[in-house]
């Protein structure tokens, strides 16, 4: 039986890409019976009834799965944040990073609209970028008005499945339009009333850009830590994870425990205060989370 990857799911149909093209498939009834929903990004076995139509027979095990957006087997996330309009927001970036790290997806931080900043804001954003690079993250500067800066992103998209996510109104769709102009994805300017952009993408689809596949997603419509526990959180902050191995107590939450290596690293300036502050805020959110039944 032929195998392929689901690149689009729409109205009960799954569009499976394979060596000979794309086949529009339906799911077998056994999926509903077993409560399995094929997702964009799934590697599947399918049966072709004719050159253009068929059925999905089997879904292979997933290495990861996101709920919002509904996509599986993601290799990396391009987290797009703007320098201005809206202003760069490290607190929101850290929230995205935690969610991405928790799902074992490699993050690439992409800061857009650098052509719109004044010198003061440029220095501020570059300082943040240097902090994140020291934590081990890749950080890129882009502008949709210069193709050269977008070209910097292209090598990161090769031979992998990427999710584009980030704050609304930062230019995610505009960036993909520059990478592949024939997409003609809709874009929205910032709402003067709300001070943020309106999401312009409505379904998940994997789009070929070079040798890679990129999903233009709704940008994580939920940023709640639904499945993350306090003990997981340290591992979602690389610099906290590194320091925590030297804490005196196993299971240290890095809040009030004595001889905590993380708190010591903050005091010594090895961990930035804003990252530690965000960590503490996220711990509080998780502890106040209502239980699910």
From Swiss-Prot:
Monomer. Associates with 30S ribosomal subunit, binds 16S rRNA. Residues 63-223 form the CP-type G domain. The lineage of its organism: Bacteria, Bacillati, Bacillota, Bacilli, Bacillales. Binds 1 zinc ion per subunit. One of its GO terms (biological process) is ribosomal small subunit biogenesis. Its cofactor is Zn(2+). This is Small ribosomal subunit biogenesis GTPase RsgA. Zn(2+) binds at residues 247, 252, 254, 260. One of several proteins that assist in the late maturation steps of the functional core of the 30S ribosomal subunit. Helps release RbfA from mature subunits. May play a role in the assembly of ribosomal proteins into the subunit. Circularly permuted GTPase that catalyzes slow GTP hydrolysis, GTPase activity is stimulated by the 30S ribosomal subunit. CDD domains: S1_YloQ_GTPase, YjeQ_EngC. Its EC number is 3.6.1.-. InterPro entries: G_CP_dom, NA-bd_OB-fold, P-loop_NTPase, Ribosome_biogen_GTPase_RsgA, RsgA_GTPase_dom, RsgA_N. The keyword tRNA processing does not apply. It holds the Pfam family RsgA_N. The keyword Nucleotide-binding applies. GO terms for cellular component: cytoplasm. It is an enzyme of class 3 (hydrolase). Keywords: Cytoplasm, GTP-binding, Hydrolase, Metal-binding, Nucleotide-binding, Ribosome biogenesis, RNA-binding, rRNA-binding, Zinc. GO terms for molecular function: GTP binding; GTPase activity; metal ion binding; rRNA binding. It comes from Bacillus cereus (strain ATCC 14579 / DSM 31 / CCUG 7414 / JCM 2152 / NBRC 15305 / NCIMB 9373 / NCTC 2599 / NRRL B-3711). It is found in: Cytoplasm. GTP binds at residues 112-115, 166-174. Belongs to the TRAFAC class YlqF/YawG GTPase family. RsgA subfamily.
């Amino acid at each position: 039986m032929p195998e392929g990857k689901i690149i689009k799911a729409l109205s009960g149909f799954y569009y499976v890409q394979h060596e000979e093209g794309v086949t529009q498939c339906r799911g077998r009834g056994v999926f509903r019976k077993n409560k399995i929903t094929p997702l964009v990004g799934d590697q599947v076995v399918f049966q072709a009834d004719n050159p253009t139509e068929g059925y999905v027979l089997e879904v292979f095990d997933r290495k990861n799965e996101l709920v919002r957006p509904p996509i599986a087997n993601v290799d990396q996330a391009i987290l797009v944040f703007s320098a201005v309009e809206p202003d760069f927001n490290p607190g929101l970036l850290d929230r995205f990073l935690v969610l991405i790290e928790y799902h074992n997806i490699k993050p690439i931080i992409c800061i857009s609209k650098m052509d719109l900043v004044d010198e003061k804001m440029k220095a501020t954003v570059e300082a943040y970028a240097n902090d994140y690079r020291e934590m081990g993250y890749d950080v890129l500067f882009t502008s949709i008005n210069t193709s050269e800066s977008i070209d910097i992103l292209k090598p990161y998209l090769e031979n992998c499945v990427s999710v584009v996510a980030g704050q609304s109104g930062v230019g995610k769709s505009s960036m993909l339009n520059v990478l592949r102009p024939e997409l003609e994805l809709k874009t929205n300017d910032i709402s003067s009333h709300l001070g943020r952009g309106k999401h312009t993408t409505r379904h998940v689809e994997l789009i070929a850009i070079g040798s890679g596949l990129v999903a233009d997603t709704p940008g994580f419509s939920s940023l709640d830590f639904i499945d993350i526990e306090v003990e997981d959180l340290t591992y979602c902050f690389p610099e906290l994870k590194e320091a925590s191995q030297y804490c005196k107590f196993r299971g240290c939450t890095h809040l009030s425990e004595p001889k905590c290596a993380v708190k010591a690293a903050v005091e010594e300036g090895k961990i930035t205060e804003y990252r530690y502050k965000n960590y503490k805020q996220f711990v509080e959110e998780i502890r106040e989370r209502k239980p699910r039944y």
